[in-house]
């Protein structure tokens, strides 16, 4: 894709995001569609997210436990492991699962509607496809991402705690005490904010690629692949920005 085409596509995407933002305040609210999409996204995301979060938490605990022992700071294993899961691993795992499972399904659904000309028919009938289809999916993805991030964080921290205590001989009291000493409420909030933003980004990219799909069934498949890849890239870039802003704005305990 050439430079002008990339800029044009980026402009169209941001215009699409603005249209979706305007649609958030419009009535009537598509409650039925929202509930259906929230249930669908959660049903395809809960089990994979829970299963992935266990090894994530375990690997983080094992790696950090080994590192802090080499540095002579074994008492801080709990703080390092829990903060890594809550701030970074939890939202990232949540976003990747939602983008891979829920986002691909959203893109495929809207892409199929596009090639069957259902979206054009809705516009002819005076129905805004963005308000009717995109807004409920974005809101559902945001809600599920926030709730799922809580589950992933709990499972990941529990897995890290278990592996640290059982496999590395850590002390349960020291594991929890170090987190209490260095952790703070904004650490939990930033994880939820990340999950909220990641869920919105995943749904917006998937919806945009689906609604602009063309070329028949093959085009829909290509749009799904592109949406997943673009979402992963956007999530890591967004994670860097949010993390950088967080460390600049929120003073850290013990610093």
Please report, for each region that a protein language model flagged, where it lies by residue.
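Short, membrane-interfacial amphipathic segments enriched in basic
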Residues: 2-32, 209-214
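Active-site cofactor/substrate anionic-group-binding motifs, chiefly glycine-
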Residues: 39-93, 97
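Selective transmembrane-helix segments that form parts of the transport pathway or gating/packing helices
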Residues: 42, 46, 50, 89, ...
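Generic alpha-helical transmembrane segments of integral inner-membrane proteins
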Residues: 51-58, 142, 146, 150, ...
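Membrane-interfacial helix-loop-helix connectors in multipass membrane proteins
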Residues: 63-87, 153-196, 205-224, 245-255
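Hydrophobic alpha-helical transmembrane segments of multi-pass membrane transport proteins
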Residues: 77-120, 205
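Short hydrophobic alpha-helical segments within the ABC transporter permease transmembrane module
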Residues: 81, 85, 125, 129-143, ...
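Short cytoplasmic-facing helical segments at TM-TM junctions of multi-pass membrane proteins
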Residues: 110-135, 217-220
């Amino acid at each position: 894709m050439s430079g002008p085409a990339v800029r044009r596509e980026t402009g169209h995407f941001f215009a699409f995001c603005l249209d979706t933002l305007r649609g958030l305040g419009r009535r009537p609210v598509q409650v039925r569609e929202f509930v259906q999409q929230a249930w669908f996204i959660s049903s395809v995301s809960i089990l994979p997210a829970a299963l992935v979060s266990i090894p994530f938490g375990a690997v983080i605990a094992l790696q950090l436990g080994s590192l802090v022992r080499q540095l002579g700071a074994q008492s801080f294993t709990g703080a390092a492991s829990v903060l890594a899961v809550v701030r970074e691993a939890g939202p990232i795992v949540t976003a990747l699962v939602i983008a891979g499972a829920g986002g691909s399904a959203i893109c495929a659904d809207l892409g199929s509607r596009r090639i069957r000309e259902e979206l054009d028919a809705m516009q002819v009938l005076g129905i805004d496809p963005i308000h009717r289809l995109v807004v409920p999916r974005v809101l559902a993805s945001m809600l599920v991402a926030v709730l799922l991030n809580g589950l992933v964080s709990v499972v990941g921290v529990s897995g890290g705690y278990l592996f640290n205590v059982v496999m590395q001989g850590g002390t349960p009291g020291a594991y929890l005490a170090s987190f209490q000493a260095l952790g703070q409420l904004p650490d939990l909030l930033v994880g939820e904010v990340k999950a909220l933003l990641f869920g919105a980004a995943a749904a917006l990219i998937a919806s945009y690629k689906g609604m602009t799909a063309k070329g028949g069934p093959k085009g829909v498949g290509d749009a799904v692949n592109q949406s997943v890849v673009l979402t992963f890239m956007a999530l890591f870039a967004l994670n860097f920005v949010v993390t950088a802003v967080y460390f600049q704005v929120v003073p850290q305990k013990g610093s």
